[in-house]
Amino acid sequence: MNTAEVRKIVTRALSDATGAGWKVYSPRTLPVMPDQYPLVIVSVQSEHKVSQGRHVPQYTTTTTLRIDGRVLAYASGDDTESAAGVAWEEAEAMKEALERAIIGNPDVRMKFQQIADIRAHIGVDSEGEGHAGIVVLELDLEYYQGPEDFFPSEIVPLREVNVRGVHPPLHLHFD
């Protein structure tokens, strides 16, 4: 496993389990059109490897993954609730959905030794036409990397095995 695989695993899980659906992005694919909100951007912040001993490349690796969620809210005609308040509440709801999609997903949890740390930040940006609710999650995902991750195997896969017996003749073919 490596950091690109970590990002892909989490991106896939978020696409499947949040209200953002297919609108989960990796860096540099962020749309600018308002009709494409809510959206989620997944990027790798950093990676830290701690050696498990001398001579053999075995590491406990921690990848810090950053998940940026964005929602957009506009002021309604009545004064019952402000767009900034709606954006904040939607950002809070998105934070909960993002955490459930990762922590509650056994396919994600089984790939890692642990989710060592989660940091969450919520805010509202009111500079544009609407109010953007912003949630930032930073997750420290810990996993093992060993020789198999650094020295790829060049073994040719087994395609056919011929087995001969006395009665009856037997041929096995693997596809």
PLM-predicted stretches and their roles:
Residues 35-50:
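A short, hydrophobic beta-strand-centered structural micro-motif
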Residues 26-34:
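Short acidic low-complexity segments
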Residues 1-25, 47-175:
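Charged, amphipathic alpha-helical segments and their flanking helix caps
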